[in-house]
């Protein structure tokens, strides 16, 4: 019986010839990650472990991004605790204000994750790095602490779902529409503790930024991880970002999948997830009554990358955000910020009536920089739209692609670029 891509990576890191779904293993870790919310909890737990130093100061990443720059005294204290721990432990990959970014955009950009790696992070969207052909998954702060101390973590080997992609995406349809389509199709628990393995000729038409978006939201279907095969695009990205040594794992021809979903990318349309779950999806052309909005957010670890900003800027160029609508643009890292500035996109956003933020998770988790009031509606390129996720419990969040978000900002209602 063959192994999936995920199972091969886990077997190698557990020094086993093979594994199967349901096996319990102890695996070596290539990177352990935390932020300013989960980091302090992990640091407190680390203090109770009989270890004075982390297992490898080069394999820990600490990124203050959720409430950074600090929004209040409490968040400042949390950032300080992470900062002091990083200093005491001489953590190589601690990223301070001015060099930080949203963690799941920053680590690939810095070359800290490569194909074949095993990565855990005390953040549920750590599954993002599957876009690079790595096994990455979110864990609790206790597992994070043990990972920092030992360089190991235990896993139950996941069963797998295969998503066989064919065709190519149409204009103004992107990876966000694909993952929303999938979550709408299988539900928020449709991939519960499964690896979501994306295969097929359609993968080649997906950019790296599209793949990051798709892997990022695997957790919104309950997935343990979401992983893409390594191809020329992946290798070019890793070489460009100095990812260092990598190893390519490919699924066996007789790998076992619980189910295969065939998806023709050319049939996908602009898709939005209605409140209050990512599975509540509709194609925009199926929305019967106009959904007017108060705010648009383009950013986050899901859609704050350069290509996302380019797509939005191309739509906004020469147009203006509708009066009464607030539009926030949040580049995911400082490099993306600079690249967008040099490309002229930030000027175009500002001239269109948007405001630009320093890199931060901010409004995505209802932290700050764009909190919603009672009764307000927001179209957001983020990844969750739970009750109260971005503010008041009686506010509403609609998840969408950068293309739909930009068009909606212009028209003041959920719309596609085709309507402009």
Curated annotation (Swiss-Prot):
Coiled coil: none annotated. PROSITE patterns: ACONITASE_1, ACONITASE_2. It catalyses: (2R,3S)-2,3-dimethylmalate = dimethylmaleate + H2O. Keywords: 4Fe-4S, Iron, Iron-sulfur, Lyase, Metal-binding. CDD domains: IPMI. This is 2,3-dimethylmalate dehydratase large subunit. Pathway: Cofactor degradation; nicotinate degradation; propanoate and pyruvate from 6-hydroxynicotinate: step 7/8. The keyword 4Fe-4S applies. Its cofactor is [4Fe-4S] cluster. It is an enzyme of class 4 (lyase). [4Fe-4S] cluster binds at residues 301, 361, 364.
């Amino acid at each position: 019986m063959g192994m999936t891509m995920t199972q091969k990576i886990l077997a190698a890191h557990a020094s086993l010839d093979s594994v199967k779904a349901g096996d319990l293993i102890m695996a070596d870790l290539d990177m352990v990650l935390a932020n300013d919310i989960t980091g302090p909890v992990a640091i407190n737990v680390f203090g109770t472990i009989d270890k004075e130093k982390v297992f490898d100061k080069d394999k820990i990443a600490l990124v203050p991004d959720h409430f950074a720059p600090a929004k209040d005294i409490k968040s400042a204290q949390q950032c300080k605790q992470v900062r002091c721990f990083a200093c005491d432990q001489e953590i190589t990959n601690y990223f301070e204000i001015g060099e930080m970014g949203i963690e799941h955009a920053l680590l690939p950009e810095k070359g800290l994750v490569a194909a074949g790696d095993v990565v855990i992070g005390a953040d549920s969207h750590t599954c993002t790095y599957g876009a690079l052909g790595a096994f990455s998954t979110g864990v609790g702060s206790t597992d994070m602490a043990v990972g920092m101390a030992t360089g190991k973590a235990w896993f139950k080997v996941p069963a797998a779902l295969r998503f066989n992609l064919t065709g190519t995406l149409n204009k103004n349809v992107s990876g966000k529409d694909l993952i929303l389509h999938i979550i709408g199709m299988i539900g928020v628990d449709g991939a519960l503790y499964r690896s979501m393995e994306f295969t097929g000729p359609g993968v080649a038409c997906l950019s790296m930024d599209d793949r990051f978006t798709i892997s990022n939201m695997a957790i919104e279907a309950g997935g343990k991880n979401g992983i893409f095969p390594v191809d020329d695009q992946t290798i070019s990205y890793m070489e460009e970002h100095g990812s260092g040594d990598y190893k390519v794992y490919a699924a066996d021809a007789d790998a076992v999948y619980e189910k295969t979903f065939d998806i023709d990318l050319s049939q996908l349309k602009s898709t939005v997830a209605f409140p209050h779950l990512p599975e509540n999806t509709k194609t925009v052309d199926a929305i019967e009554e106009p959904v007017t909005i108060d705010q648009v957010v383009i950013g986050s670890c899901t859609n704050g990358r350069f290509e996302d900003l380019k797509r939005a800027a191309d739509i906004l160029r020469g147009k203006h955000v509708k009066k009464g609508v607030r539009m926030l643009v949040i580049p995911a890292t400082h490099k993306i910020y600079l690249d967008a500035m040099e490309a002229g996109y930030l000027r175009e956003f500002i001239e269109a009536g948007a405001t630009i933020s320093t890199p931060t998770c901010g409004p995505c988790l209802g932290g700050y920089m764009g909190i919603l009031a009672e009764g307000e509606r927001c179209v957001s390129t983020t990844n969750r739209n739970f009750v109260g996720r971005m503010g008041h419990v009686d506010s509403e969040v609609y998840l969408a692609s950068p293309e739909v978000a930009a068009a909606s900002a212009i028209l003041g209602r959920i719309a596609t670029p085709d309507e402009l």
